[in-house]
Amino acid sequence: MRHQKSGRKFNRTSAHREAMFRNMAASLFKHELIKTTLPKAKELRRVAEPLITIGKVDGVANRRLAFARLRDKEAVGKLFVELGPRYATRPGGYLRILKAGFRAGDNAPMAYVELVGRPVVAEEVAE
């Protein structure tokens, strides 16, 4: 029986799942907005939010913890230099998941995952 076993499997091996969420978290920290399926977005919260909490206190030990989970120097750097200070006073809830309809090929529910309070760049209108 599968009672009290949390987390989705996504029909992948544990190594594939771990690599997928590592890559998704790194992309989220770099771009601050990604589009993925709704179940993956919900599961990504469990990976990314604790990393941002680690990023709030800069130090060698915390940087090594973050690097062990992300394996991406650029993402870890941004996590501690930019994202950690941005969320220093926020007690959790760093991500927002917005539903984005259904994918054309397989009708999978899609969602945008974005960092709360990210700076929105205004696009210039060509006249």
Curated annotation (Swiss-Prot):
InterPro entries: Ribosomal_bL17 (IPR000456), Ribosomal_bL17_CS (IPR047859), Ribosomal_bL17_sf (IPR036373). Pfam families: Ribosomal_L17 (PF01196). Keywords: Ribonucleoprotein, Ribosomal protein. One of its GO terms (biological process) is translation. One of its GO terms (molecular function) is structural constituent of ribosome. GO terms for cellular component: cytosolic large ribosomal subunit. Belongs to the bacterial ribosomal protein bL17 family. Part of the 50S ribosomal subunit. Contacts protein L32. This is Large ribosomal subunit protein bL17. It comes from Xanthomonas euvesicatoria pv. vesicatoria (strain 85-10). The lineage of its organism: Bacteria, Pseudomonadati, Pseudomonadota, Gammaproteobacteria, Lysobacterales.
